[in-house]
């Protein structure tokens, strides 16, 4: 995000892309203003939380009028650095990795996977979704200045790969493996364990489904 913006709570920062996506849809439909109640219904975040999130950035709307869609869209585009492209490297071209490469964040103009790594000789040297696949041994040579990585590799190799990424100056890792990665404090890791998320969903459906 833009370093000139005020520091905001992490929970708020995670919701900003959600707001931005909805505002893009509103803009595309020709809508010129939106209320916090409408935003709340669309993104499934309560109105009070939305107003508090927006308050960290000053007066973005007017009471009784709502929010100007074009203004908000422009503001959040700048806040989220949507005019700058962040290049990403993906590790592990299995089923999940292949899905990422074919999708390649097509709805997010500022994020793009530009290279992938694997050890399968049938995949190395090919392109998946237009993205070149290199051998893992080429990591140090090919990574260059990329600072964001996605891991979709077997759990047992996640930490060794992470250690190499740390040495290359990586700043952020989106980890889809069950492994809990150990990194220096200045490196950001988001763990996404799909099996755990699914188990959690099933549990809540069984025990809290009627609430």
Swiss-Prot record:
Q: Which InterPro entries match?
A: CoA-bd (IPR003781), NAD(P)-bd_dom_sf (IPR036291), Rex_DNA-bd_C_dom (IPR009718), Tscrpt_rep_Rex (IPR022876), WH-like_DNA-bd_sf (IPR036388), WH_DNA-bd_sf (IPR036390)
Q: Show the Gene3D superfamilies listed in the entry.
A: NAD(P)-binding Rossmann-like Domain, Winged helix-like DNA-binding domain superfamily/Winged helix DNA-binding domain
DNA-binding positions are: 18-57
State any single GO MF term. Answer: DNA binding
Its GO CC terms? Answer: cytoplasm
SUPFAM superfamilies assigned to the protein according to its UniProt record, in alphabetical order: NAD(P)-binding Rossmann-fold domains, Winged helix' DNA-binding domain
Keywords attached to this entry: Cytoplasm, DNA-binding, NAD, Repressor, Transcription, Transcription regulation
GO BP field: negative regulation of DNA-templated transcription; response to redox state
Classification via SMART domains? CoA_binding (SM00881)
Where found? Cytoplasm
Q: Which residues bind NAD(+)?
A: 92-97
Q: Does the keyword Ribonucleoprotein apply?
A: no
Quaternary state and partners of this protein? Homodimer.
NCBIfam families tied to this protein: PRK05472.1-3, PRK05472.1-5, PRK05472.2-3, PRK05472.2-4, PRK05472.2-5
What PANTHER family does the database record attribute to this sequence? REDOX-SENSING TRANSCRIPTIONAL REPRESSOR REX, REDOX-SENSING TRANSCRIPTIONAL REPRESSOR REX 1
Family per record: Belongs to the transcriptional regulatory Rex family.
State the function annotated in the UniProt record. Modulates transcription in response to changes in cellular NADH/NAD(+) redox state.
Q: What is this protein called?
A: Redox-sensing transcriptional repressor Rex
The upper taxonomy is: Bacteria, Bacillati, Bacillota, Bacilli, Bacillales
Q: Which gene encodes it?
A: rex
């Amino acid at each position: 995000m833009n370093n000139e913006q005020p520091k905001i709570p992490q929970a708020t920062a995670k919701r900003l892309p959600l707001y931005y996506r909805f505002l893009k849809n509103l803009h595309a439909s020709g809508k010129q203003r939106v209320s916090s109640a409408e935003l709340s219904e669309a993104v499934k975040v309560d109105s009070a939380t939305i107003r508090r999130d927006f308050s960290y950035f000053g007066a973005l709307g007017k009471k009784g009028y709502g929010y100007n869609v074009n203004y908000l869209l422009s503001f959040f585009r700048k806040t989220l650095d949507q005019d700058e492209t962040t290049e990403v490297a993906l590790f592990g071209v299995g089923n999940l990795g292949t899905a990422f490469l074919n999708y390649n964040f097509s709805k997010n103009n500022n994020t793009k996977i530009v290279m992938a790594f694997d050890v399968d000789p049938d995949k190395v040297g090919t392109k998946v979704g237009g993205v070149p696949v290199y051998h893992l041994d080429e990591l140090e040579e090919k990574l260059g200045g990329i600072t964001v990585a996605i891991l979709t590799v077997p759990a047992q190799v996640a930490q060794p790969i992470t250690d190499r990424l740390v040495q290359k100056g990586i700043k952020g890792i989106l980890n889809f493996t069950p492994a809990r990665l150990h990194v220096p404090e200045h490196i950001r890791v988001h763990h996404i364990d799909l099996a755990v998320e699914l188990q959690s969903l099933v549990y809540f459906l069984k025990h809290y489904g009627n609430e």
